[in-house]
């Protein structure tokens, strides 16, 4: 039985993760952690999500809980995740990281920690999105430099980073397939007199509105035709189930930095 801890357990995604763990065979929720100043500290994690009492109370200190879990699932904020990363590294605990918005330097910290503990880090844990990444690689290689490529994403009003981690990952996959450096060819939004579109650039457009869980479209546009690869999520549960699947997959894995493509056997 894989003992799973959920960080940010009182938040929207944290509550969904608690539900997903409760539904997963071979997994048990053994710890739930949130901010130390949360008014919900001490509450039963099961009651937070309508499951009734499960005997796991919401804690405010990850370091005090390290003996209670095998793997930590963290969908929080880069600054929080990096602190948790150090705790897990020192304790030899595996991690599943769904936090987005890391800088290049911060991602390097994940890579360094993965030399000592197994980590699954993905911008998106949806099976459908990861299938789309595979399709995007194929589409980019087939369509090549004859198309203009734009990535359009939409999320709820509360999302704090833009473009989304998933949109950026999609851009990386396309750029890698075409032998381009995304940092050099990405164009983030357009305004005013921008001039004609530069060939070989990859454009990003962002929408933040309502309660949109997550929509992503990659547009390959040529003269006379276009190909669109789209994924739309209607529930956070799809991400939560993928994260729990990753946590179970990490059992007996050697230290390394994995992603959802590894979990799904798509490599």
UniProtKB/Swiss-Prot annotation:
Coiled-coil ranges (or none): none
Binding-site positions, NAD(+): 8-13, 34, 98-100, 122-125
Keywords: Amino-acid biosynthesis, Cytoplasm, Diaminopimelate biosynthesis, Lysine biosynthesis, NAD, NADP, Oxidoreductase
Top-rank EC class of the record's enzyme: oxidoreductase
Pfam family, one: DapB_C
Entry keyword Ribonucleoprotein: no
GO molecular function: 4-hydroxy-tetrahydrodipicolinate reductase; NAD binding; NADP binding; oxidoreductase activity, acting on CH or CH2 groups, NAD or NADP as acceptor
UniProt EC number: 1.17.1.8
Main location: cytoplasm
Location of the active site: 155 (proton donor/acceptor), 159 (proton donor)
UniProt entry tagged with the keyword Cytoplasm: yes
Known pathway: Amino-acid biosynthesis; L-lysine biosynthesis via DAP pathway; (S)-tetrahydrodipicolinate from L-aspartate: step 4/4
Function summary: Catalyzes the conversion of 4-hydroxy-tetrahydrodipicolinate (HTPA) to tetrahydrodipicolinate.
PANTHER family cross-referenced by the UniProt entry: 4-HYDROXY-TETRAHYDRODIPICOLINATE REDUCTASE 1, CHLOROPLASTIC-RELATED, DIHYDRODIPICOLINATE REDUCTASE
Xref: HAMAP family: DapB
Full protein name: 4-hydroxy-tetrahydrodipicolinate reductase
């Amino acid at each position: 039985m894989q003992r799973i801890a959920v960080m940010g357990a009182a938040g929207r995604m944290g509550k969904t993760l608690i539900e997903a763990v409760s539904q997963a065979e071979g997994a048990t929720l053994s710890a739930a952690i949130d901010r130390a100043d949360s008014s919900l500290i001490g509450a039963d994690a099961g009651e937070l999500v309508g499951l009734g009492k499960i005997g796991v109370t919401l804690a405010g200190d990850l370091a005090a809980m390290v003996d209670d879990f095998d793997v930590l699932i963290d969908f929080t904020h880069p600054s929080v995740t990096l602190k948790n990363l150090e705790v897990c590294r020192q304790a030899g605990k595996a991690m599943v990281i769904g936090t987005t918005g890391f800088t290049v330097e911060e991602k390097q910290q994940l890579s360094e920690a993965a030399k000592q503990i197994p980590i699954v880090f993905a911008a998106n844990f949806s099976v459908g999105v990861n299938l789309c990444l595979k399709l995007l690689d194929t589409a980019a290689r087939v369509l090549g430099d004859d198309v203009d490529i734009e990535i359009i994403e939409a999320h709820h009003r509360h999302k704090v980073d833009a473009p989304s981690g998933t949109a950026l990952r999609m851009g990386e996959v396309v750029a890698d397939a075409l032998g381009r450096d995304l940092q050099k060819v990405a164009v983030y939004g357009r305004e005013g007199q921008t001039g004609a579109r530069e060939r070989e650039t990859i454009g990003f457009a962002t929408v933040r509105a309502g309660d949109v869980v997550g929509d992503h479209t990659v547009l390959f546009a040529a003269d006379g035709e276009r190909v669109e690869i789209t994924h739309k999520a209607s529930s956070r549960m799809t991400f939560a189930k993928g994260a729990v699947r990753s946590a179970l997959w990490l059992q007996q894995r050697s230290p390394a930095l994995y992603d959802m493509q590894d979990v799904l056997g798509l490599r």
